[in-house]
A protein has these predicted regions:
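Hydrophobic, membrane-interfacing alpha helices
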Residues: 1-222
Length: 222
């Protein structure tokens, strides 16, 4: 694993790339909103994403309580220097998704825009991350190239054919992406800790497939 030294703190390069992808994803989302939505909605949607990201960051740092509570009890300052790793990231993603939909449903944003914005932002972040990882990381090149190409193709389609980004197409894309990610994770023989034969990341994609199948044709308010 590649590490970047920032003062006295050593940070994995992949986390820095993810942080950069999160903010670049917001810029891409803002461009999409300008292209497709009324100006009055722009700030409301962007603020919702900022709040969701902050909540996800708190979940990521706080996940150490669940993953290694003994370490936190013995050394509370470990929360400043350590995270829950990939498992913690999965918990953070789940937490931020729940927060996003919970807050969005209390707003005047339509279900369609909530779903489209969340989908576009997620795929933009994934695409940017895999592009940066392909260029700057040494491991899992195949995963980064394939996942990056797939997600960027979806983002480009959403930009130029936004009226065709329907609920069914969104969940179909999520299902295909989840199967693709699962296949790549099995091919690369991940060494992550297993929970009932799967890693936390693999279980996330299994859950995403199930949720997508449930909501694929569920009616929503326009």
């Amino acid at each position: 694993m590649q590490v970047i030294q920032i003062g006295s703190i050593a940070v994995l390069l992949k986390w820095l790339l993810l942080g950069a992808a999160l903010f670049i994803g917001l810029a891409i989302l803002k461009l999409w909103l300008r292209r497709t939505q009324e100006k009055i909605l722009h700030k409301q949607v962007i603020d919702l994403f900022f709040n969701s990201l902050f909540f996800g960051f708190i979940c990521w740092k706080g996940s150490l309580f669940i993953i290694d509570p003994v370490l936190v009890i013995k050394s509370p300052l470990s929360l400043l220097y350590f995270t829950g790793g990939t498992t913690g990231l999965v918990l953070a993603v789940v937490g931020s998704i729940i927060f996003y939909f919970f807050k969005a449903n209390k707003s005047n944003i339509t279900d369609r825009l909530i779903l489209q914005s969340g989908f576009l932002y997620s795929f933009a972040v994934i695409g940017v991350y895999h592009l940066l990882a392909t260029l700057l990381l040494e491991e899992q090149k195949l995963n980064h190239i394939i996942s990056g190409l797939y997600t960027f193709a979806i983002v480009i389609f959403a930009f130029w054919k936004h009226q065709m980004v329907t609920q069914q197409r969104i969940f179909s894309s999520l299902i295909l992406f989840s199967f693709l990610s699962l296949s790549l994770s099995f091919i690369q023989l991940s060494v992550e800790r297993k929970i009932w034969f799967f890693s936390a990341q693999q279980w996330f994609f299994v859950a995403l497939i199930i949720v997508s199948l449930i909501f694929w044709d569920k009616k929503s308010k326009s």
